[in-house]
Structure formats: structure tokens, C-alpha cells
Amino acid sequence: MKKYPLLFCVCLLCPLIFAGSRVSAAMDPDLKAAIRNLFSGLSDAVASEEIAVLPDGIDVVSIPGCKGLRLDPRFVRVQPHVWSESCGLMDEFTKVSMIDKNVVAAINGTFYSTQGALGQIIVDGKIPHEIRQFSSRISRCFFGIFSDGNNKKWVLGETGISSSNLLKDGFTGKSRINRPITTNDKLEGLLGGGGWIIRESRDVHMEAYNRQNFRFRKVDQDSRHTVLAMDELNRLYILVFESGANLSKISESLRGKREFSRITDAVFLDGGSSSTIVVMGKYLVAPLYLIDKARLSALFVFKLPPISHK
């Protein structure tokens, strides 16, 4: 019942917000931050408090200012996913769930423009043709999936190599990968275009600005952030940090909060109004402005059949 007054406020504010969106570039930074923080609270109220019991190997992580999931590679598989329609993550999750009943969750993916995705994407060992992708010549971060035919391995890393060259020549030059890779490991999936927060358990978030050339306006530096992190047990965390936390504060939380067990590496992907998490057909993290703006790419989570547990 507590949600209804908040939703009533949304109905009153939406005409003002969307009328003002035409001049958002000239909007006073303090006003923009205040509006964003208001909608952050509203989206939290809209997010479901009744997520069903989750399958083994998937746990909800929730601390003030951050929600997400912790994934155990023994029980789940993750896969980059793309779509070309102008629909959000919830609609795409619904479509996938009609085809594969094992789908459990999804989080928004890499940065995008009207032309396509701004990062490398590989799905099932191939370049998806549903969307265009543009990878920067500047070395950016990625989440990757390798397989030796029997076991899959999740990694975080950095490369400036295009998807086609990655499939042809592999990771060469100045690429980084946070876990050992053998000659038997084949690249199955990749979601790129991100920036560093933590590497080898150290805070390296300034590299995203100084070396990886990310340019966030000051007012957007503490907007929402979509974050992928790995711990010493090779578990993957898919997270959204709410407005108010910049990369420095996110790094501090990941390295200091007991809910995050010895994080070794963390990267960010597209954030702001794109940051969204869907779990079991409900929003664990609802869209910032209550309009699902996740587009083109995402990371989907599927439960494994019990016989597949390794």
C-alpha cells in the first residue's frame, strides 16, 4: 500500500520531467541530481519485494544503495544476449522466458547509441547479426565466457581487439584476463565496452578516466552504475549501484562490505537510466525513470539442470 502515494507523485511529475527532457542538456546540475535521486527512490518502491525462491547458486545481494545477484558457476550459466527491437529488458526477458523456461534473471549490458552497441559482443562463439556493434580502439573492459568442451570459465578483462579479430586470432597484444586461460579454452561469449573499478583486488577506477578515456559529466559521475564483479571463488556479481555512489565509493563498497566476499575484479557497463535487473519476471532493480531504457544487449542468467552441476 505504501507504493501508491509514490506512484501518484510520479503521475504528477512525469509531464514536467518529460517536458523538461528537451532541455535536459541545459538543466541545472543540482536540479538534475535532485530529480534523479527522487526517481531513484520511486523506482526502488516499484521494484518487487516478492521475488520467488531462487534456484540453487543464485543469491540476492542487498545493501543500502545497491542490489543485485551473486552467481555460482557450478549451478548457473550466463550468456550475452542481443535484440534489435526498441523494447526494454523486461519485455525481452519475457520473450526469452517463453522459449527457455530455465531463464532466471537479466541485467542490462553495454553502452549504446542510435547506431548500435558501443562494445564487442560475442554470443555462442559468433558475432550476432541482429545489431551493429562498434568497438573502440581504446582498450575497454569485458565479461567473457570460455569453454574447454566440458567446463565453462567466467572472466573479466580488457582488450582493444574487435570481435571478429578476437574470434580469429584470440587475445593478443595488451589484452588482460583475470583468470588463467589454456590453449583448450574457446571463447564462447563476450560483452565488452566497460571500464575498470577493481583489478587484482586493488582500486583502479581512475584508469577508466585517465587511460580508458571515459568521459562522464560531473552530474553523471554519481548516477546509477551497472557493475559486474568476481570474487576469489570465481562467483559473479551482477549489481546496480544507485544514484549517489561514484566509482570511488563503489570500489570502496566492493572491497569493504561483508556482503562482497573478497572481490578480485570489477568493471562497469552502461548505467544511468539503462541500469535494470529483472529476476523471475519482476524488477529487482526497476528503471530509474520508470521507463525501461535498457537496449540492444544484456547478460542473461539461466539455471543449470542438476545433472550438469560440476
Regions found by a protein language model. Give the residues of each.
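Short acidic-glycine loop/turn motifs at beta-strand connectors
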Residues: 72-73, 145-154, 199-201, 230-234, ...
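Bacterial N-terminal signal peptides
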Residues: 8-16
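Extracytoplasmic
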Residues: 64-66, 100-102, 192, 223-225, ...
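Active-site neighborhood of phospho(di)ester-bond hydrolases with catalytic His/Asp-centered motifs
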Residues: 106-109, 266-270
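Flexible, glycine-rich surface segments
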Residues: 173-240
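Conserved, well-ordered active-site substructure
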Residues: 116-137, 141, 212-268, 274-310
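Zymogen propeptides
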Residues: 20-161, 239
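Bacterial N-terminal signal peptides that target proteins for export
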Residues: 1-8
